[in-house]
């Protein structure tokens, strides 16, 4: 297991701090909290959320909430996409080859289970409830990589193979979550022609800043053109392409927080992976890892702001959506991961990592039930601001209870902690 502790701890503390401040503020004065989050930074701006100005004109206003959720969070999703991309394409990537088969099948169960529980219970509560909450079906599918890792390390010990299994599952879950956001939760009327700008920017920067210099360097051991590109222009071509791609996503109606994903795939990367958010990656000097290192602290601050912007929910907001999200996470996740993991390991013959027991899948499922970050994000786009959104967010916040459940289940199943 690689050293990811410092990154995850910094990520977690600021995010939790922002969420706690938001919760306290919202329960003291909910009106001032909403006034703060929706303060307009730039009226009639070229970017921002669309609305009618009351005179028949559709304009965009850049609010503080939009700035954090739709613009700055694009950097967080870019880092998540970077880890997924490397895990899939690099020679020893953790999601490459047969070793990832069982975690990937278990990930599918970790999505099917929560969706089935969420929609199933909502259906039995009646058509009124079902119609009100159905669009939130994706909220309990999320697994928060950082918090799941922290709890998994606490339950299993840093050296236990179940922790690596959990990380593979969480990062595959992140990849699936990005797809769900892009496909099922557009941010407005779809205008897919604008995606030509995004993918055109990605193709252009890949050809001009990545492929062409390497092509011209054939036979040149000093790789002068690639070195000049890296030393003189650095990340700037990709930053400009990222701005164009983000704008294309915003105009297309897809969620703009995903707007940097096409650009991530074009950036020169290392030929090997050290692990998820690994500290060993400081020894890699490819542009993709260099950019991730530079973004580390800004993204920690952004996540703190994200917690502040999204976790401000009054406790009186608890409702049916709260319990549906919790049921999806606390029941659907463990059941789905165990059943699909068993299916992969036994009938399909894919097996489990050496040192893992079948019962460990139940504990992994409990740990993976911590949704928080991505669950909050999905709740904010699945529902319009109001009681249902607030209730769903409360369910995402309460998913921290999965940490206590995981510790208890770990004790009951006699997990033997393995430290490095």
UniProtKB/Swiss-Prot annotation:
**Reaction equation(s) it catalyzes:** Na(+)(in) + 2 H(+)(out) = Na(+)(out) + 2 H(+)(in)
Q: Where in the cell is it found?
A: Cell inner membrane
Biological process according to GO: regulation of pH
Identify the Pfam families for this entry.
Na_H_antiport_1 (PF06965)
Q: Name one GO molecular function term.
A: sodium:proton antiporter activity
Q: Which InterPro entries match?
A: Na/H_antiporter_dom_sf, NhaA
Q: What is its main location?
A: membrane
In the bilayer, the protein is annotated as: Multi-pass membrane protein
Any transmembrane segments, and where?
A: 4-24, 70-90, 104-124, 132-152, 165-185, 192-212, 233-250, 299-319, 323-343, 361-381, 395-415
Q: Which UniProt keywords apply?
A: Antiport, Cell inner membrane, Cell membrane, Ion transport, Membrane, Sodium, Sodium transport, Transmembrane, Transmembrane helix, Transport
Q: Which GO terms describe its cellular component?
A: plasma membrane
Q: Describe the function of this protein.
A: Na(+)/H(+) antiporter that extrudes sodium in exchange for external protons.
HAMAP family per the UniProt record, alphabetical: NhaA (MF_01844)
UniProt similarity note? Belongs to the NhaA Na(+)/H(+) (TC 2.A.33) antiporter family.
- Its protein name is Na(+)/H(+) antiporter NhaA
What organism is this sequence from?
A: Jannaschia sp. (strain CCS1)
């Amino acid at each position: 297991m690689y050293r990811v502790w410092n990154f995850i701890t910094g990520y977690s503390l600021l995010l939790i701090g922002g969420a706690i401040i938001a919760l306290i503020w919202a329960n003291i004065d909910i009106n001032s909290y909403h006034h703060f989050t929706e303060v307009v930074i730039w009226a009639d701006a070229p970017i921002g959320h669309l609305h009618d100005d009351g005179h028949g004109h559709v304009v965009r206003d850049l609010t503080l909430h939009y700035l954090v959720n739709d613009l700055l969070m694009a950097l967080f999703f870019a880092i998540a996409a970077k880890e997924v991309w490397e895990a899939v394409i690099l020679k020893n990537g953790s999601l490459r080859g047969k070793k990832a088969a069982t975690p990937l099948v278990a990930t599918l169960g970790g999505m099917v289970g929560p969706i089935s529980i969420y929609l199933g219970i909502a259906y039995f509560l009646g058509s009124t409830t079902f119609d009100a909450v159905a669009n939130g079906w994706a909220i309990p599918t999320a697994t928060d990589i950082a918090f799941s890792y922290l709890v998994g390390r606490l339950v299993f010990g840093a050296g236990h193979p179940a922790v690596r299994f959990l990380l593979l599952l969480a990062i595959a879950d992140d990849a699936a979550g990005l797809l769900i956001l892009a496909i099922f939760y557009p941010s407005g009327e779809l205008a897919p022609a604008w995606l030509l700008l995004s993918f055109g920017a990605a193709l252009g920067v890949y050809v001009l800043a990545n492929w062409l210099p390497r092509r011209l360097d054939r036979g040149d051991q000093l790789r002068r053109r690639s070195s000049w590109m890296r030393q003189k222009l650095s990340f700037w071509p990709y930053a400009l392409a990222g701005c164009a791609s983000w704008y294309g996503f915003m105009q297309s109606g897809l969620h703009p927080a995903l707007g940097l994903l096409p650009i991530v795939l074009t950036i020169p990367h290392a030929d090997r992976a050290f692990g998820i958010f690994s500290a060993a990656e400081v020894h890699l000097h490819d542009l993709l890892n260099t950019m991730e290192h530079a973004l580390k602290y800004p993204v920690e601050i952004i996540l703190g702001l994200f917690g502040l912007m999204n976790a401000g929910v009054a406790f009186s907001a608890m409702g049916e959506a709260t319990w549906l999200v919790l049921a999806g996470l606390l029941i659907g996740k463990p059941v789905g991961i165990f059943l699909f993991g068993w299916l992969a390991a036994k009938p399909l013959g894919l097996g489990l990592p050496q040192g893992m027991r079948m019962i460990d899948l139940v504990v992994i499922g409990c740990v993976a039930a911590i949704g928080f970050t991505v669950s909050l994000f999905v709740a904010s786009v699945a529902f319009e601001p109001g009681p249902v959104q607030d209730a769903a967010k409360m369910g995402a916040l309460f998913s921290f209870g999965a940490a206590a459940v995981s510790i208890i289940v770990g004790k009951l199943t006699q997990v033997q902690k393995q430290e490095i």
